[in-house]
Amino acid sequence: MALASSGSGAGLLRFLRLVGQLKRVPRTGWVYRNVEKPESVSDHMYRMAVMAMVTRDDRLNKDRCIRLALVHDMAECIVGDIAPADNIPKEEKHRREEEAMKQITQLLPEDLRKELYELWEEYETQSSEEAKFVKQLDQCEMILQASEYEDLENKPGRLQDFYDSTAGKFSHPEIVQLVSELETERNASMATASAEPGS
């Protein structure tokens, strides 16, 4: 029994080190756009989990939403953050990430292995209301981050293509409201910038 426990401890340590690499995997979209000090995949998933935690939608299983947010990009600790600009077919991206998730979860006891893999699969297949909500959080968090980079660089509108890529993808009322508020703020910033002399 002590041996099994020691083995699972070693597996857990390897698992934690592996997912810890997400802190050092930059989000590729920002790298390609030459954003200074781009966020990590881990940064992105953390705020998504917080966004899930503060939802007021009682129809959703909030705990499950948080778990989905924390697992959805976990494979990127092995495969990296594959962006649309990488021109890797969706099926190939899925295959790589599926292999990575199998590799990652093999380090865990069977019950946890099953739970994490099934959460990842649920998100990938969008097979629940929670998965669909978290997918919208993923897109919403991205444009929120884009607006913050525009503010930090004092270049309103520079990352417009990230907004364009999410057009028509939001349907959950809370997220629609949040995005509307974000767009109002951003439009005001862009209007101010264009009104400044020399702009």
UniProtKB/Swiss-Prot annotation:
Disulfide bonding pattern of the chain: none
UniProt-listed Gene3D superfamilies: Hypothetical protein af1432
SUPFAM superfamilies for the chain: HD-domain/PDEase-like
Sequence positions that bind a divalent metal cation 2: 76, 81-82
Protein's UniProt keywords contain Hydrolase: yes
EC number: 3.1.3.89
Record key words, sorted: Acetylation, Hydrolase, Magnesium, Metal-binding, Phosphoprotein
Modified-residue entries (Phosphoserine), positions: 5, 199
Enzyme category, top tier: hydrolase
Gene Ontology MF, one: 5'-deoxynucleotidase activity
Role noted for this protein: Catalyzes the dephosphorylation of the nucleoside 5'-monophosphates deoxyadenosine monophosphate (dAMP), deoxycytidine monophosphate (dCMP), deoxyguanosine monophosphate (dGMP) and deoxythymidine monophosphate (dTMP).
Record protein name field: 5'-deoxynucleotidase HDDC2
Organism in which the protein naturally occurs: Mus musculus (Mouse)
Lineage: Eukaryota, Metazoa, Chordata, Craniata, Vertebrata
